[in-house]
Amino acid sequence: MRPEVEQELAHTLLVELLAYQFASPVRWIETQDVILAEQRTERIVEIGPADTLGGMARRTLASKYEAYDAATSVQRQILCYNKDAKEIYYDVDPVEEEPEATEPAPSATPAAPAAAPAAGAPPPPPSAGPAASVEDIPVTAVDILRTLVAQKLKKSLADVPLSKAIKDLVGGKSTLQNEILGDLGKEFGSTPEKPEDVPLDELGASMQATFNGQLGKQSSSLIARMVSSKMPGGFNITSVRKYLETRWGLGSGRQDGVLLLALTMEPAARLGSEVDAKAYLDDVTNKYAASAGVNLSAPVAGGDSGGAGGGMVMDPAAIDALTKDQRALFKQQLEIIARYLKMDLRGGEKAHVISQETQKALQAQLDLWQAEHGDFYASGIEPSFDQLKARVYDSSWNWARQDALSMYYDIIFGRLQVVDREIVSQCIRIMNRSNPLLLDFMQYHIDNCPTERGETYQLAKELGQQLIENCREVLEVAPVYKDVAVPTGPQTTIDARGNISYKETPRTSARKLEHYVKHMAEGGPISEYSNRTKVQNDLKSVYKLIRKQHRLSKSSQLQFDALYKDVVHALGMNESQIIPQENGHSKKGGRSAAKRNTPTRPGKVETIPFLHLKKKTEHGWDYNKKLTGIYLNVTESAAKDGLSFQGKNVLMTGAGAGSIGAEVLQGLISGGAQVIVTTSRFSREVTEYYQAMYARYGARGSQLVVVPFNQGSKQDVEALVEYIYDTKKGLGWDLDFVVPFAAIPENGREIDSIDSKSELAHRIMLTNLLRLLGSVKTQKQAHGFETRPAQVILPLSPNHGTFGNDGLYSESKLALETLFNRWYSENWGHYLTICGAVIGWTRGTGLMSGNNMVAEGVEKLGVRTFSQQEMAFNLLGLMSPAIVNLCQLDPVFADLNGGLQFIPDLKGLMTKLRTDIMETSDVRQAVMKETAIEHNIVNGEDSGVLYKKVIAEPRANIKFEFPNLPDWEKEVKPLNENLKGMVNLDKVVVVTGFSEVGPWGNSRTRWEMESKGKFSLEGCVEMAWIMGLIKHHNGPLKGQAYSGWVDAKTGEPVDDKDVKPKYEKHILEHTGIRLIEPELFKGYDPKKKQLLQEIVIQEDLEPFEASKETAEEFKREHGDKVEIFEIPESGEYTVRLCKGATMLIPKALQFDRLVAGQVPTGWDASRYGIPDDIISQVDPVTLFVLVCTAEAMLSAGVTDPYEFYKYVHLSEVGNCIGSGIGGTHRLRGMYKDRFLDKPLQKDILQESFINTMSAWVNMLLLSSTGPIKTPVGCCATAVESVDIGYETIVEGKARVCFVGGFDDFQEEGSYEFANMKATSNAEDEFAHGRTPQEMSRPTTTTRAGFMESQGCGMQLIMTAQLALDMGVPIHGIIALTTTATDKIGRSVRSVPAPGQGVLTTARENPGKFPSPLLDIKYRRRQLDLRKKQINEWQEAELLYLQEEAEAMKAQSDETFNEAEYMQERAQHIEREAIRQEKDAQYSLGNNFWKQDSRIAPLRGAMATWGLTVDDIDVASFHGTSTVANDKNESDVICQQMKHLGRSKGNAVMGIFQKYLTGHPKGAAGAWMFNGCLQVLDSGLVPGNRNADNVDKVMEKFDYIVYPSRSIQTDGVKAFSVTSFGFGQKGAQVIGIHPKYLYATLDQAQYEAYKTKVEARQKKAYRYFHNGLINNSIFVAKSKAPYEDEQQSKVFLNPDYRVSVDKKTSELKFSTTAPEAKQSESTRQTLESLAKANATENSKIGVDVEHIDSVNIENETFVERNFTQSEQDYCRKAASPQSSFAGRWSAKEAVFKSLGVSSKGAGAALKDIEIGVDANGAPVVNLHGAAAAAAKQAGVKQVSVSISHSDSQAVAVAVSQF
């Protein structure tokens, strides 16, 4: 074959191969799957210049095959020819064998093994000599070039291929490219032209010619900086080079190569020691050797060969002998110097001996104390009282309104349907808090209750009115404790399976407390006795003594008197005599024993009540009928009418959850008492328990104070009482009651096991209880309170050792009874009165709950056990005035034992009852098991599956919901009559999407926490994904296919239902407001806040080493205060700072702002899909903004931002996102890190600008040319942004805008806010017992500054018309936005002004009568009139059009195109008519109130939608938790409402979101706005859960209610958001429910929109889930939607729109310019006019009608004006409304063309019928009067044409004569 043929064939083959290569897909994924999965290849070698495919294979293995390989024991090796040559060829360096350890060579050390090329070598042994030198080669230009590029890109050398140019490597980042080129210029002096376009290898080769082989300025500077910042102190550049030379034998050129490589492997932080530094250098050196192909040898060892530098081993003894004299000399010198300085060198040892002796003595005392008291006692007496931690609850006025509102909605939603005990109880609680504010509030809601909505509303109105009347009656009456709950009894059941269950069931015999009191008074059979029997028996003894009296001495006379007294006592039912008579000889108590001892005639039978009082007699405490009667009367009265404790001060201990004391406490605060209650377990949970109790039960005038307290501590006892009586620093109370119920259990301790806990319990229940009373007595005496003794309710017990096994419990209780005698014998009776209460069996308490199961059996014996409510009722009865008065005369002993004392051997009885129950249970369980076994044998093992209980656990269903669309008939249609067509939708601004990044993740997860206080399962899954705890896996896992969530750390599969239990604790700990986590803020720890302090050096310092450049800089700064000298060996310099030089020394300040709201730990922008190179370049807040933008669009259902350009031009998408500060991390770097000379990116300045974040949004997502406005309003930025965006859209400058705000948390801002005293001091808060989550408490009494936070919030807003056209969801209407400043600051120049300027939103000066413009019906009449005028103008213009064309034709040349002129003019007329109509809508609908001093902006904005100021249901407050802001802001809102005439009692519900999120500054208003949009959609108003006690100052703001819990309403119409920022920024936004927008449409338009929204929601749902799975919620755009050559055309033509490219399926602008829109309706109209003008003897009639002007819902109108055939035709049309309008227009046009006289505007047009011919064209048929009039006028024929546009119908009729 000839050469030329071969050459041709070769060329053809090459072309074909290349074509095949380029045309075919690469299919790397499939290729790798074949190699790795099917072939299971273990060794892969890449041949090529760089490790490209190998890197790809490694990533694939890590993501897909790592677990698979581990399970199948496959070990793979990925090698690359350019760096793994030795491994590929198995060319391993030989290793010398070490001599055996048993025969060491004394003269030589073993040679160190040769280091593997890629492994870090250990430090050399001390005796090792220098390594063999390696041939030195200087670095090349390409080495430096590649290193500088890699270092700037933060990549390894392997990731910077030499075949690529700088332009390719930077990925289009021009700033980064400029930095690299600048570095190259600094390094090499000059560079070739356009070096960025030249591949690195070629660029390096071109610069090699002029390269001198030395490191340049840039590389030297980078190396010097790396060494100084990352090497340990003292290990300088000289040390580094010396080590590389001695350890590895590298010359200066090779050293340069190693150091260049080190620049791309720089440690993350400074290395800790020289050993670490050497290990790091060894690692770098080995990698350098591998890449350079250098064989490094180990250091040469010294030995017999006497190699150069060999080491010598010396005998340690010889060294010791050699240095002995030196050490002795040093010691002598030290002693001489010590004597001179008069120092005792042994002083420390002497002091140590003395301290040891003292320590032994002290330890002996401690050991003795410990041995005597024990550990439990020692820890149990530690004081815990701290008045700083006191919680004061007294805002009953606010909770009353909250409870009333909740009750109102409970009735409306059917949760309360009948007036049961619970409703009555709620009503009583509300009545107890009755006040004028509450009455007005309730009256408004009842007066405006829409009863037409259903029965529940009617019920709410009826019950509400009754409650109002009841509240009015008790307005001046003291609050009372009145329990209306049904008394309950114990019930224990055992089911067929043997399961024991206990519950409280209503007692059938006692339906209310009145019945309960009656039963208690009646007693029972067990407490019966016969008084006649006792009298008879005693009289027998008397008679016997009388008969013997003459033989008795005087002592017998005394015995007679005693017996006589016993008879008297018997007549008074002396209990002490009854018990031995009935129970003395038998263990069986009750009726039977009594019967056996009575005669045939038992006499009168009486009973002792179950609750009774005793009186002290010589025989002890005896039942007293009179006192008992007083007590029972009191309890009966309390059950009927209640019991008041108004004005009483009470001290309670032992009132924990589930205790009797807690129930007593509820009764006291229900009755209006002021109570201080103590808790030994002070925590947030405990204070929340008491706060919830007060919010529920606290009556008017009541107060609850909760303090930490340990009754085991004497110090606490004294401090507590002092706090109560201290008028300056304490409460300043005088106690009326002391209820010391504190106790600890001692179960299981018999007499031989009295331990440390028993002693502590005895101390608590006896010793310190007496101390407590003594302290009260002391304080009363000190303050002179002798006439107001405090009643002490002593908690006595019937257990006097009866039960046993309870340590010193019974002794403690029994010893309290001594107080009955001490009251007489001691001198404190004027200050304290005693009422001992023997507390009976109370079910459910901590002490007795274990006995609940036997309570029913015990009651069957005729005694009574009590519920906690019943026992509390009994005790509260003892605190009634009547019993208090008795106590002031004598101590009172109350037996509340329920008859238990009549049961002998109670413990044995309980044991038998418990045994019987357990035996029954065991038998039934055994029977059930046997039955199951038998069933399985007979029917098979699986036969019982259908009968087993299976709990179905719900799976996570992460929804992506759009706002609920209202029902047309129920919600929209009632509004449609007034609102239809009343606004210009192009001037209405709506919110179509919103998003946020904040401490609680995103807007969805934040709303869950805000509205419900907890995360759902779905919320936990999303939060776990956000925090990087889980990730989605789709592929093989452990040898099986798996698709689902896996743990991000372990890779273990995680079922979605397990996410909440597994991760929720971690999620809650690392979200929200919490202690600052240093890892989120580059190590910032407020406990060690770094500051710099300048000092002047007093002595010359030791020299250190630096580069020449650095040394010269030191010299330049310090002058003669510094000495620098060159080191000849290395070219480095030594630097010595001399006396007088200044230094900045770091110091650590313990800063007190330790808490902040922080984004969730683990939040990572890359998880959303943002590329790593963007993350590394931009400020963190930019990432917040980018994520928010993507999520806001997704919230609007927009999955591709270029979709906007299908509907609007590029110039109509705007960005108004702003910030208070901007990129704080970059600002910090620019000012602080640059000052510290830390390495920073060169373009850091641009990343700090506030508008840079918006620029990134446009560069990566939007590619728009619309308006960009960047508000800076500090804390009000987000609302100011909404204001700017709103105005931008209304002014027509944009149709779509992104609005919102962002800000970060940074230590500098935190410090300066603290200096202003604006933020919450965490140390103070901790001292007050607050947790981080409680530190932001808006509106509370204890609010103490705002809590900083970080994040971004955003909304996507657009015109309503565009939203309807696109079919995006509408979350709300923006009705009004305003901003305002404040007054002059001359007296107090305060930048954070009080915000009163926002009052101007309500500015108006109305006349005597309201403006008619506020009446929407008036405005509709005006609009209809204006529309009629516009129609008439349009008709006239169309009629004149032919004449105008003729005139133009006469004036123009022959080229004049009449048809085109007519078309354009007709289109202009149509556009102008539409414009005029929209202007009319705008002026009479949207804008009528502007510039009118009689109408406030707020009132006008509401009236636009047919609403009033009364329809603002919710106000979201800036609410920063500062003392001034919360008060001022409430005042502003309240004044606005009052000025605008809001109805009395109509209080808005306040939302204070910052309790949860903290204050993010710029993002604050956006988060609040998002929350309000969620309120609009759900109707649920979230409460301020940290509002434990609303400040009393807020009570005067009667137009605001401050909820602390979420309230589900029946719908919210409108909301207000207020925001205030430093710099006198005040802002307010009014938002309205979107149903009012839908009411401006007709039903067909609404249904069409609804269909589009539903389709968009499905698309968004799919995109969202794909984003979670694939980390692709954010997808950056790589290019604009147009080609470069199209740019100017697209920019300059406003009609350009994108369309889907059929090849790429991308949205792009077409290469052809858009054609002018031709209106078909205009064309038809012109044709009709032309025909009419061409016809002689004719008359034209033109009519224009708005499509929605014909009311086809009015059947009378349709019947009068349309024939049946017309009606049938129109109703079958696609749009009946348009068809009817067209027919009506045609009728009007025909009438005008006839030229006959009119019968008036109300005349029917049925006689003019518009039919259709065979082709569907309209035909005129005249009937009746119309036909007669036409005939009379000489009309021969009438024709008509009808055309439609989007909004109107045009008809042209021609009558021929």
UniProtKB/Swiss-Prot annotation:
Mg(2+) binds at residues 1743-1745, 1843-1844. The modification O-(pantetheine 4'-phosphoryl)serine is found at residue 174. One of its GO terms (biological process) is long-chain fatty acid biosynthetic process. The keyword Phosphoprotein applies. Gene3D superfamilies: 3.30.70.2490, 3.40.47.10, 3.90.25.70, 4'-phosphopantetheinyl transferase domain (3.90.470.20), 6.10.140.1390, 6.10.140.1410, 6.10.250.1930, 6.10.250.1940. GO terms for molecular function: 3-oxoacyl-[acyl-carrier-protein] reductase (NADPH) activity; 3-oxoacyl-[acyl-carrier-protein] synthase activity; fatty acid synthase activity; fatty-acyl-CoA synthase activity; holo-[acyl-carrier-protein] synthase activity; magnesium ion binding. Pfam families: ACPS, Fas_alpha_ACP, FAS_I_H, ketoacyl-synt, Ketoacyl-synt_C. Belongs to the thiolase-like superfamily. Fungal fatty acid synthetase subunit alpha family. NCBIfam families: pantethn_trn. This is Fatty acid synthase subunit alpha.
